[in-house]
C-alpha cells in the first residue's frame, strides 16, 4: 500500500483567515493560499496558478496563525485530503503541518 502524501506550496494568503474551535475543543484556522509560478513541462515554460484551501489544526500551531493576514507570503507543508462542502461537492484541502513566512525583502 502506498502511503506517501506530502505537498509543499508557496504563495500569498488571499482570503481572511477564519478561526474556529471544533466541538471536541480543537482549534482550527482556515485560509486560502494563492500560488502563481512558471514551471517547466516537456521542455516548455508553463504558467501555473491555483488557490488551495489551508487548514491549520491544534493548539500548538495557533500562535503562528495569528500573524497570518491577507497578503502574507507563506510556504506551507503538509498533507492533502478531500473535504465535502455544504454544497455536497468535494474539494482538495492542504492540512498544514509546517508554515514558514517568506521574507519579502523589505
Swiss-Prot record:
> Which first-to-last residue range defines the signal peptide?
none
| Entry keyword set | DNA replication, DNA-binding, Primosome
Q: Name one GO biological process term.
A: DNA replication, synthesis of primer
A single MF term (Gene Ontology):
single-stranded DNA binding
Question: What residues does the SSB domain cover?
Answer: 4-103
Under the heading SUPFAM superfamilies, the entry gives: Nucleic acid-binding proteins
- Family the entry assigns: Belongs to the PriB family.
What protein am I looking at?
Answer: Replication restart protein PriB
Q: Which organism is it from?
A: Yersinia enterocolitica serotype O:8 / biotype 1B (strain NCTC 13174 / 8081)
Native organism taxonomy: Bacteria, Pseudomonadati, Pseudomonadota, Gammaproteobacteria, Enterobacterales
Amino acid at each position: 500500500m502506498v502511503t506517501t502524501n506530502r505537498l509543499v506550496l508557496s504563495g500569498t494568503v488571499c482570503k481572511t483567515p477564519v478561526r474556529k474551535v471544533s466541538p471536541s475543543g480543537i482549534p482550527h484556522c482556515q485560509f486560502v493560499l494563492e500560488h502563481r509560478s512558471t514551471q517547466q513541462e516537456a521542455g516548455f515554460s508553463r504558467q501555473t496558478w491555483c488557490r488551495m484551501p489551508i487548514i491549520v489544526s491544534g493548539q500548538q500551531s495557533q500562535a503562528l496563525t495569528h500573524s497570518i493576514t491577507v497578503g502574507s507570503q507563506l510556504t506551507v507543508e503538509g498533507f492533502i485530503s478531500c473535504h465535502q462542502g455544504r454544497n455536497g461537492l468535494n474539494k482538495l484541502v492542504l492540512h498544514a503541518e509546517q508554515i514558514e513566512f517568506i521574507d519579502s525583502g523589505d
